[in-house]
A protein has these predicted regions:
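Active-site environment of non-heme Fe oxygenases that use a 2-His-1-carboxylate facial triad
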Residues: 1-21, 26-27, 34, 39, ...
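"Short basic amphipathic alpha-helical interaction patches in structured regions
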Residues: 52-59, 128-130
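A short alpha->loop->secondary-structure connector
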Residues: 55-69
Length: 167
């Protein structure tokens, strides 16, 4: 990884080859898409890289897992989950920018990635559930509930609308 090689917005799958990691990343992708839906990866040497190099590696690997996209209307490519001391009771504050415990929720993506740079002194645990695995378990136990999953749901974008999106 070289911080002066590419800007994040210039990175593509082709411009960020993974000659030694490629097969492993493809196996992760298969696990995510057709297996358990969850893949824990450990051992990226983030302590040896600058923040720019970490971002480049994360974004580049992401291109091998899917198609990364902007995180918000400001077109930020990477969102940082940390406490910015924002008011938790403000309905427009994103909870990932506070020290609040975040309940299970759905992110608007097929694949979500998290990379820990600095473990929290307290808390900071992530819980994940594969929607595919959850669907299959629910289908086995309560198939009569499945039609409800295909009904429209309310979506709270916390005031972060990208032009052309419905609220």
């Amino acid at each position: 990884v070289s911080q002066d090689s590419l800007a994040l917005e210039e990175v593509t799958r082709d411009s960020f080859p993974l000659p030694t990691l490629g097969k492993k990343v493809e196996a992760w992708r298969q696990t995510i898409m057709t297996g358990t839906g969850v893949q824990v990866v450990k051992g990226l040497p983030v302590g040896q890289w600058s923040e720019a190099e970490i971002a480049l590696a994360y974004w580049g690997i992401g291109h091998h897992l899917g198609t990364p996209g902007a995180q918000n209307p400001d077109n930020e490519l990477l969102g940082h989950v940390k406490d910015y001391d924002e008011a938790r009771d403000d309905p427009f504050v994103r909870l990932y920018r506070t020290n609040s415990n975040i309940r299970y929720h759905c992110d608007a993506a097929d694949i979500v990635g998290l990379l820990c740079l600095k473990p929290a002194k307290t808390g900071g645990k992530s819980r994940v559930v594969s929607t595919g695995s959850l669907f299959n378990a629910l289908y086995q136990r309560h198939p009569e509930w499945i039609p409800r999953l295909f009904e429209p749901i309310k979506l709270d974008r916390r005031g972060e609308l990208i032009e052309g999106q419905k609220p």
